[in-house]
Amino acid sequence: RYRPLPVRVAPSGQITSEGLAAWFIPGSFRFCLNCGVAYDGSVRSDLTKLSGLSSEGRSSATTVLTISALKYLIGTDLGDQAKKVLGFTDNRQDASLQAGHFNDFVQILLLRGALLAAIRSQSARQLTDDVLTQKVLDHLHLEPTDYAANPEAKGIKAQNTLKTLRDVLGYRLYFDLQRGWRITNPNLEQVRLLAIDYQGLKECCEDEAEWQKGHPLLGSATPQQRYAIVHDLLDRMRKALCIKTIYLDPNFQEQIRNRSFNELREPWGLSEDERLFSHAYMVPRARPTADRSEERIVHISWRSMFGRRVRAQASWTGNPHFPRKFDEETYNAVIDDILRVLATYGYVERTGLDCGRLGYRIDSSVLAWKLTDGFNEEGAGSINIFYRTLYDNVAKLLQASDRFLHQLEAREHTAQVDTDIRVDREARFRKGLAPQRIVEGAVEPAGLPVLFCSPTMELGVDISTLNTVYMRNVPPTPANYAQRSGRAGRSGQPALVITYCAAKSPHDQYFFADPTRMVAGAVNPPTIDLANEDLVKSHLHAVWLAETGKELGSSVRDVLDLEKADSLPLREDIAAEIARSGVRAAAMARGERILAMLKTDLDAARAAWHTPTWLENVITGAPLRFDEAFRRWRSLYRATASQMKLANDILNNAAATEQDRREAKARYDEAYTQQNLLLDARPTMNSDFHTYRYLAAEGFLPGYNFPRLPLMAFIPGRKEKVVRDSFLSRPRFLGLSEFGPQSIIYHEGSTYRVKRAILTIRDEGSVTASAKLPLQSARLCPACGYGHFGNQREFERCVNCGHKLEGGRGISNLYRIEQVSTRRAMRITSDEEERQRQGYEMITTLRFAAENGKPRAEAAAFADGGQTLLELRYGPAATIWRINLGWRRRQDKSSYGFTIDVNTGEWSKDLQAPTDAEDDTVREGKTVERITPFVEDTRNVLILSPRTALPRDVMVTLQYALKRGIEHEFQLEEAELAAEPLPDADNRCAILFYEAAEGGAGVLTRLASDVDALQRV
């Protein structure tokens, strides 16, 4: 079933009779055809086993270059406050990924370097299990402030903390023996710096009397032949963690976890929900067909790679007892006798398993951790010389008691980090590599030498002396480059600016080929669309709210009457204040003055919405829109209250199982936490539910840096408030994919998996066991992709192009997604070069705004020699729907959406999902419904349609060439302009452009109205 098949692949990715020769491996990746590493069923995701063809090590390159820069800075005569590196990236999650990658990389270097240094310090050049952790700890040169939750502790508390640290080190050292668990960082054994031997194994293989008791093949073999076979068997068991050691015992691991939680701090302690891998058992038989054992079992049968070696005559050269027919029965007899001798000598231990099977583990006391005998670089083959040299250098640093690596720490600095934590990091970063000090009896924290930030650090943050800036990618525009590079080298000081250009990034390579365009490029003045109706309207709402003279407070609970739970209306005093006479007249007067300032921008061509009565309608309707702006908050509040009630009913149900009670308690606690966040009354504007920030997010007030109507993800808090309970916000079009089912979110050193949608149902009565979610339906035109909703679904022809709707895509289970909830998955490791992304099939559809019952759109054409080449349609304030159709690799392409348990909101097990898309925690839902998530918003759009149908590859090239040209001409960031194929990626008949940034820059308006603009593009 999983046998690799030879194929030939064309450049398009299609299987052909000609092309590049390759091997196709059905199902998930189970073993490597080159090095032989194998994976059992416990490792499901291929993302943890393989790196993509497009992966080029951006994160590793950034980490190594940053460490190198700091190493150089330490050798200079600069002050400690200048010995630091500020790193930039364009994405918040990339900043979190890079900080986590850096910290994990440093910890791995310290752990492996300390092991190597400890072995070198021994006269016998080897370590054994009884002294392993203590010797490694000695050479780590850690101080209590590095690892202890209470570094001031003395006596028995300090001793217990050290014991816990040794136990955690023991687990990490043994787990590091597992082959294939690290993709980018080969361990010491893989780079031939470490050899694991088995004490006295040669003497065991020379015991003729013992071997004569077994199969004649073993009795007549030479000691060298026995040694080669036995050593290979033990190596395979060891690399699969078939080791009997207290550090891999699941019961002891729980004790370590509990003690670590109380006594250690990260990164040396275990994180509270870190998945610990326990020992496995080796069974020398094939896996039974119906094997459902919960134990980790490694099968080394006669069909395995080891079995093939045992059956190979070359392994027994000159042996007269090599059987003519080496069948399974013969193999079983041979390996059973090998294991019998090894058990006699104490190398392995037998354990009875289910179904009468015997499992074997290596006794850790026989392991000898040694240096390799020698290394010839010319014959190194696939050995990574870089890592070999790196580990060797780190070991030398530790042997010299150098604590350079101990000082290195990276943190993220983005808008999604709490304000007080961000301020603390800025203060620490200003100190650079300054050590921790005791000032007047108080501990003054050490400096922070590395800060990876999003563009929030471009302006307005005091970071004191800075000489080195690192950019993880080429900035979008010369203006961004000038701002970021300008953070270094103040007051005429020299500075170093490093920019990483990814080989697979067209944007990076474009400027790598011509760096002058970026480094010395002209900085154009920023553009903004002052004729954007939503932009002007939100400012007029702010004027109206100011004229009411009412302070709203910092929490929405100060605005709504929570005593009236059914409707949650505005509080009576606020309702009376905004309806006060005189407010409307004052707001109208100020509004007229504002519009007069925009007179030149609000012409008929660019602002058709601006009618003589428009201002009056906005001001008159402001009280109603103010009330409606709290609809989403009310919906969220009711959803959390309903979730708490449902969970409480289960907790009070005597017939509920213990499992149901635990799950209900977890859901109750989560909903309670979310409700507290909704009611948050902290004065900081960092809360997404601060009244004014919330109104800005709803589009009622100007948002500036805050996304309008964002998609939100709940992030549960962690130990010691490293991460507080919070909501992360994303612009909705971006959030639909970033916060999709089972997607991974990177935040504060950890990954979080989206496990649940917060069902903001308007009718709370529908949140029951027979719930049916409020779904919508749509039909898309097969020719132009235009969306038909409501009564338009019954039309026979498209209202946009007139084509028949028959044969178009019909979606009957659309659900507007607004909030999701996550669970912590794991710590960010240095294995991750790029963020893990789930493969969704996303489509975009649109509907023009209506004006006098007709679509509001302007048409234009470009011709050459009297022949029309391109047709343009510009639609101001068109409604765009972004739809997540489901997994890109789903089995049934006509089945849309994802399965969800409507009681809990959890994304449930989906038969359509690829094998690696869901982890082991995904379960069958009890009341399951299939929904297709979507979001919508209004944007100015420009549709470009070639008059003559073009091949698919030409349309793809045209789309990206035009997008890149528009960005270059108008100096837009890549994320500011979106381009989508219509009707979909497989049938490209037209290209849809819309400005993805809030407010927009008015670029599409200029393209539609300026004859020369498109020619310049």
Regions found by a protein language model. Give the residues of each.
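Conserved segment of the helicase C-terminal RecA-like domain
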Residues: 487-529
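Short peripheral tails and domain-boundary helices/loops at the edges of structured domains
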Residues: 761-793
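Short, well-ordered loop/turn sites that connect or cap secondary structure elements
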Residues: 491, 736-740, 745
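Short alpha-helix capping/helix-loop boundary micro-motifs
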Residues: 726-738
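Charged, low-complexity interaction segments
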Residues: 1-414, 419-425, 438-440, 444-445, ...
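Conserved two-lobed SF2 helicase motor
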Residues: 443-459
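Short, Lys/Arg- and Gly-enriched loop/turn segments at beta-strand edges
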Residues: 751-764
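A short beta-strand element within the Helicase C-terminal
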Residues: 457-473, 496-498, 746
